[in-house]
A protein has these predicted regions:
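Acidic/histidine-rich, surface-exposed loop or edge segments in extracytoplasmic proteins
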Residues: 3-13
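Cleft-lining beta-strand/loop regions that shape enzyme active-site pockets
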Residues: 80, 85, 94-97, 104-281
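Extended, small/polar residue-biased N-terminal targeting/export presequences
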Residues: 12-71, 115-119, 123-147, 336-339
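Generic structural signal for buried aliphatic residues
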Residues: 90-91, 118, 301
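C-terminal "exit" segments of structured domains
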Residues: 282-289, 293
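Conserved functional hotspot residues or short segments at active or partner-binding sites
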Residues: 301-302, 318-339
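PDZ/PDZ-like domain segments forming the peptide/carboxylate-binding groove
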Residues: 51-92, 96-101, 163
Length: 339
């Protein structure tokens, strides 16, 4: 085959004697990443490594070939306090170039024993020179859901969809003023479970399809909404952007389709997938995407994500967010009446 001919030519005619094992491994890893940035090839020595530890830098990275981008940061965590923000580019971790490692290995480098320091070479937004930042790993304490209210409406910030967030969210719903607009901020949200996302959707949506889970050589699995109460009558605004990822994308889609929500911001990440691990005969494994998701509005959230109804590039400072949204909403309503 052409592939074997290429390998033979590299081995026989390259200017220096190549390490063919590294050539082949790099080629396989590159092919896997082209299929999906979460895919990884793990060799036997990778699998024999001890767990790095439970402390974390408080950020989620997504590998993009020779670099990584920050997908989300945990509010109040080490990365957040150091000024890292979603969308920033990271080129090296502890001096190691990211083009030489898998997505699996990259994530492990951001974990370790509490107090461990890692060096991050990063490119903050709107800069051309790299900045080195030291992060000290911590056992992350996730803050409560953000909640702000005023006489005109309320804002709930969902920075993750971990276990228990659905109950916490339900409690906050009981504090809302009747018929006042609710702003649900799903930005900077990439962690959580399908169950929690579905439970929150059941609190705000009418009956219907929540998501379709697609796997190779298996029937599609449809998850449906089964709300115990009628859909609340409040006006619902969902904030989203490229840091809205995974199950948060399914929640945004369901709220848009069955909760009559309007989505503001920009398109979500398009990373609605689940990984699986396949053992290999020589002791290694493939960690690859084995399930892809479709949203309630038939969006392919594994690729294109959920589009925003109202594009907004800059929401302004966080402490003014609720006023900005409600002022914009009021201007939109007044403009519609005038027309």
């Amino acid at each position: 085959s052409d592939l074997q001919d290429i390998l033979d030519l590299i081995n026989d005619r390259y200017v220096e004697v190549p390490d063919m094992e590294l050539v082949i491994k790099g080629g396989i890893q590159s092919a896997l990443e082209r299929s999906h940035p979460f895919n990884s090839w793990l060799n036997a020595s990778d699998l024999s490594e001890e767990d790095p530890g439970g402390a974390s830098a408080g950020m989620t990275l997504i590998k993009r070939g020779i670099y990584a981008s920050v997908l989300t940061v945990v509010p109040g965590g080490p990365a957040d306090r150091a000024g890292l923000r979603p969308g920033e580019v990271i080129r090296r971790l502890n001096g190691l170039s990211l083009n030489k490692i898998s997505a699996w290995k990259m994530q492990r480098l951001t974990r370790g024993p509490e107090g461990t320091e890692i060096e991050v070479q990063r490119y903050p937004k709107d800069t051309v020179e790299p900045v080195k930042t030291i992060l000290k790993l911590e056992n992350i304490k996730f803050p409560p859901l953000g909640f702000q209210t005023s006489s005109r409406g309320s804002l709930i910030t969902l920075s993750d969809l971990r276990a228990g967030r659905d109950k916490e969210f339900n409690t906050l719903l009981g504090r809302l003023s009747p018929n006042q607009p609710l702003i649900l901020d799903l930005r900077n949200n990439s962690e959580g479970t399908m169950e929690v996302a579905l439970n929150i959707a059941n609190l705000l949506c009418s009956e219907g399809l929540f998501a379709t889970l697609r796997s190779t050589n298996k029937p599609n699995v449809n998850l449906t909404l089964t709300p115990s109460n009628p859909r609340p009558s409040m006006k619902l605004i969902v904030l989203q952007d490229s840091s809205t990822s995974g199950v948060a994308e399914l929640l945004a889609s369901a709220l848009k389709r069955h909760g009559k929500a309007k989505t503001w911001g920009s398109q979500t990440a398009g990373l609605g997938v689940a990984l699986g691990r396949i053992p290999l005969s020589q002791g290694g494994a493939l960690e690859i995407v084995m399930e892809r998701w479709t949203g309630a509005g038939r969006e392919e959230v594994d690729q294109t994500g959920v589009k925003a109804d109202k594009p907004i590039k800059d929401f302004g400072p966080q402490d003014r967010l609720i006023d900005f949204i409600l002022d914009t909403l009021n201007d939109t309503v007044q403009g519609s009446k005038a027309s």
